[in-house]
């Protein structure tokens, strides 16, 4: 190949095996994906701002395509690349005293699988009538009868690519943390962020192959006349749900665990002392990872599970609240009595703890199978998981950004602007997602672009909140610009 005409700098980025460069690429990529995903969420809230058809002109399929793309982009192209690929690549080698990751070239391909995956996902949304299946891609809605055309197939290939990317990354992190620690750095002395990435990597390694199998069988059902999920050929759509949620539930812990790690690091740094109950924190994360793999059917209380099965999954789900509670109170105990300077990272830590508790409490409510049957597939669930994602994982990303941007870029962020961003985002997401619990209890179903007039009040409030948080996202990019262009250089 003739590379003479291509800028050398561009090639350095393309072929880089340096963990910091790759971490930076991940962070930039996730920021772009975040813009797309946030814009899609704004479209959803504009449609739901008032009853009747607003911007999708009664096209329910298009609405569901937007919902599906929003979910996939936020989960697989914003949160995972930022927390695991971005901060994980940047700081795990530094925290364990390793010169780089164990497999630097594999690290490079892990990142470069993501842009084509995003391209495939966007393609799936814009060809024919799009993939309007929801991020769960349940058959028979995702079958070839209900979703003809290439859209769902493209979405499946996109998932395969992100899955391979995450799998390679997980192998890389496990090898790095096992084999490349500095002499004397035992497992019981690892920083909590490193622990969180290690546990996340094991969860990915355990669950992603199951997802790959599930969606590959869906692919053959659609194109090669198999009937894994088709009752007319002796298959069962509930099998898909079991396989999907065996991945899907650990996935939400994959999203939140690295955020737990960041929150632990930042809380300890601002309290100027060690994390309270270090070993308890480690074993709490291990327990969350283990329990997260044996509670998947709590997503399926409405498919007609046996009563004993429902009892088990309810009980097991509630037990996850115990290690989570240990972490919450250990963070509070870490901050307790510290001489706290209320700078932006600490504000995000406090916001994280407060809102994660709200998200956790609604989660415990939903673990009751009897209650869940009433609120399943309503906005109560949307409210719950956006509290733990939009205010758990994303607050974790912002915490890491404000805490580490000096180390990443060598420049200081403007403190006053950071605090304005925190308050804008904090107020915006709460106004957006708190009313959803009321709407869910009133029976407003998910994935439907219209609703009864009686629910217009809280929907208007929710949409107003989303405009605030959308503005705060734009403001955040202004802060990034100011930091990189005009930011004061850090001391060392």
UniProtKB/Swiss-Prot annotation:
GO terms for biological process: electron transport coupled proton transport; mitochondrial electron transport, cytochrome c to oxygen. There is a cross-link at residues 249-253 (1'-histidyl-3'-tyrosine (His-Tyr)). It is an enzyme of class 7 (translocase). Ca(2+) binds at residues 47, 52, 449. The keyword Nucleotide-binding does not apply. The chain crosses the membrane at residues 24-44, 72-92, 109-129, 154-174, 192-212, 243-263, 275-295, 318-338, 346-366, 385-405, 422-442, 467-487. It comes from the Eukaryota. Its EC number is 7.1.1.9. Pathway: Energy metabolism; oxidative phosphorylation. Component of the cytochrome c oxidase, the last enzyme in the mitochondrial electron transport chain which drives oxidative phosphorylation. The respiratory chain contains 3 multisubunit complexes succinate dehydrogenase (complex II, CII), ubiquinol-cytochrome c oxidoreductase (cytochrome b-c1 complex, complex III, CIII) and cytochrome c oxidase (complex IV, CIV), that cooperate to transfer electrons derived from NADH and succinate to molecular oxygen, creating an electrochemical gradient over the inner membrane that drives transmembrane transport and the ATP synthase. This is Cytochrome c oxidase subunit 1. The gene is COX1.
């Amino acid at each position: 190949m003739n590379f003479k005409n291509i800028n050398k700098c561009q090639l350095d980025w393309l072929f880089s095996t340096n963990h910091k460069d790759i971490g930076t690429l991940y962070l930039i990529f996730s920021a772009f994906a975040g813009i797309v995903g946030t814009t899609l969420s704004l479209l959803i809230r504009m449609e739901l701002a008032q009853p009747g058809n607003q911007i999708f002109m009664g096209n329910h399929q298009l609405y569901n395509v937007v919902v599906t793309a929003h979910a996939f982009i936020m989960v697989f192209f914003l949160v995972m690349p930022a927390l695991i690929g971005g901060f994980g690549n940047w700081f795990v080698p530094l925290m364990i005293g390793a010169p780089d990751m164990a497999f630097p070239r594999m690290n490079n391909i892990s990142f470069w699988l993501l842009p084509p995956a995003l391209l495939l996902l966007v393609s799936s949304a814009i060809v024919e009538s799009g993939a309007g299946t929801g991020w769960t891609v349940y058959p028979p809605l995702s079958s070839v009868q209900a979703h003809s055309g290439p859209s769902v197939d493209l979405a499946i290939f996109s998932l395969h690519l992100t899955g391979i990317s995450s799998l390679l990354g997980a192998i890389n992190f496990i090898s790095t943390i096992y084999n490349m620690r500095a002499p004397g750095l035992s497992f019981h002395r690892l920083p909590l962020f490193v622990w969180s990435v290690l546990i996340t990597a094991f969860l990915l390694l355990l669950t992603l192959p199951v997802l790959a199998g599930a969606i590959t069988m869906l692919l053959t059902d659609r194109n090669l006349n198999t009937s894994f999920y088709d009752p007319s050929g002796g298959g069962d759509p509930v099998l898909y749900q079991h396989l999907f949620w065996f991945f899907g539930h650990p996935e939400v812990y994959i999203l939140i665990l690295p955020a737990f790690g960041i929150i632990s690091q930042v809380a300890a740094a601002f309290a100027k002392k060690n994390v309270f109950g270090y070993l308890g924190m480690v074993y709490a994360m291990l327990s969350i990872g283990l329990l997260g793999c044996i509670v998947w059917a709590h997503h399926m209380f409405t498919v007609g599970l046996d009563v004993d099965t429902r009892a088990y999954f309810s009980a097991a789900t509630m037990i996850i609240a115990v290690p989570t509670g240990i972490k919450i109170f250990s963070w509070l105990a870490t901050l307790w009595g510290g001489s706290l300077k209320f700078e932006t990272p600490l504000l995000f830590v406090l916001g994280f703890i407060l809102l994660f508790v709200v998200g956790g409490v609604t989660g415990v409510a939903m673990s009751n199978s009897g209650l869940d049957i009433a609120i399943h597939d309503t906005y109560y669930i949307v409210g719950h998981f956006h509290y733990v994602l939009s205010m758990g994982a994303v607050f974790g990303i912002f915490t890491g950004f404000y805490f580490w941007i000096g180390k990443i870029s060598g420049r200081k962020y403007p403190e006053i602007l950071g605090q304005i961003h925190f308050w804008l985002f904090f107020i915006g997401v709460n106004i957006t997602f708190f009313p959803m619990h009321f709407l869910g209890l009133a029976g407003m179903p998910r994935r439907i672009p219209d609703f009864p007039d009686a629910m217009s009040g809280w929907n208007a409030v929710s949409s107003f909140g989303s405009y605030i948080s959308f503005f705060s996202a734009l403001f955040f990019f202004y802060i990034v610009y100011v930091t990189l262009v005009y930011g004061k250089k850090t001391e060392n």
